[in-house]
């Protein structure tokens, strides 16, 4: 097989052993498609690798190329920044759950918010200590919930980057979606596991007779009841991606998908807190304010509720619908000049209703029996992201100096709104009266207060009556009068990857200019706040090849990010965050006879004008302040192959991320894990009756304390740390002439229980059995 790097090419996608399940309906679709398309090509076909794509011919857990660092296909060792690649084979082996779990084995990432939180955005993550809200899909901002079935690989870029406009300084997550494979065919698989977990999944590529058109059909169905008192979720995903070669030098592409989730909002009402008077300064009383914390109301994670706890009931709902559309066009003017356009639209509509007993407080009427009041909420959020990107790549030489120049423009528009949020609380006299009126008219019995003794005595609160969504919409008051927010961002950027000294040294220089407009409107369409601004940012990095196997790299950059915070006194929007970052380190490949590769990096990031605004469940208001933050640390990533059939991936990070300045000084940043270690390994039997059997597993160890909230009043709500083990096995065989792969995954093998992120716990031990058939 020949491998060429050409300006325009057919994307190559890796066919691993699919672990998720495909729907029977889509099998029929694929079978129908296969009558219209015929396989074309032989094993000697030339594979052309596009400068805009990153699929590799080789498989495995390691990767040698990236597109996220420079905007074009580039060797990882030539990029002057830390980039971690999660390959499709690693995803197949390690992933049971969702996109969140796919990132568990990156040592610099932790989840910071709960899933199903009643907002249109996915879970936020902490990267190098900073909360990250910018999830990219194929290099384009506007990340909503990403179904695992869409993902071909994930690239995590550490630190700010001039390519991506309003990026967070800790880094960004770029999801590379699946495109049609070079060869026709695919897989269908089925699975079943604990907690009534079932699923079906299909992934099939069809190609036209002349090989110009490729279509990839994707489908995924999952359903499970969960392991909590009331839990469970059903997911249905349908997707189609395609490429078409208009000419030898011009190719179009698209992807369309719809992902629907229904179930109980368990992660929205899973865990709880308690207020315990604490003598923080050791003076013998609990009446002082110590570093912003009132001793009488010191708040901690709950100490008495069982791990199966959930305060929602069967009358609560979670319903989310996410739609994706991406179109692209590439054209090659010559071997050294390529242009690409990509347009993306993401729409989401999410509705959730929940009953929550959030914080248990001291009970003056019955000391020792803490009490919590109910919060019954219905909310709907809708978000639309539309992004258009145009990139022009030009390669040229000036004497002995080689250039890879990227010129780009990105237009991003976001509209966020929805039908609002409505709530009725048992602890509010006026709202309790409305609940009592609904009860009188319907015969429902509502629980206004929950006591510690109720939990300890096993009261079945999950069987309680709750207001229906229509009752909350009809009788509750809307929490706020905001209608929609609009964000319009224009980004111009230029990067040049310059190679000197016979390619022994390369410098990456970049500049980015951003113009943004933000506006929010009240109900009725009246504009209540607006903000305009612009900024120019720079990036400068370099890679020096010490020898063929070891490279030194360094990178400095600043970043600029609009934010949604408003001054509570004036209502005016607060200006953007700014940040400066520096990192340096070593990248090494093929050490010890080609067995060891990896990287080590040190970094420092400073971020200013940070709106620290977190919902406070005690007051049901937002605590807000403007601070400065700083994070520094060391990261190590290793890929080791003791033998050809044994792979080990290990990573470690030490991160010291705290608030600096005059407000909340010394508070650790939310989700920042001081020490985090991950390891994943697999071993393939290469001889004997079990030839082909692949076994492995991984461990994730996080050392606390891990801050759960970003405000000072909740500084004692922390996770002490945890260790989780996961196992898997795959066995390929033949049934007649049909290739079949059997699999088993055990997630959280020791059934460890911990608070994964703010008010959300991890999943209980899960067994998943799967069978996959090649089509």
Regions found by a protein language model. Name each.
Residues 38-39, 377, 381, 393, ...:
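Conserved C-terminal beta-signal and adjacent last beta-strands/turns
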Residues 150-152, 162-238, 246-250, 323, ...:
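Outer-membrane beta-barrel translocator/receptor signature
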Residues 245-247, 383, 402-421, 426-432, ...:
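Structural signature of Gram-negative outer-membrane beta-barrels, strongest in the C-terminal barrel
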Residues 203-229, 233-241, 245, 322-332, ...:
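Surface-exposed extracellular loop regions of Gram-negative outer-membrane beta-barrel proteins
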Residues 50-183, 584:
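Acidic, small-polar-rich N-terminal luminal/periplasmic segments of exported/outer-membrane proteins
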Residues 222, 226, 241-245, 249-332, ...:
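Acidic/polar loop-and-plug regions of large Gram-negative outer-membrane beta-barrel proteins
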Residues 504-507, 604-606, 625-709, 750:
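Gram-negative outer-membrane beta-barrel transporters
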Residues 332, 338-344, 348-356, 576-653, ...:
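Membrane-embedded beta-barrel scaffold of Gram-negative outer-membrane proteins
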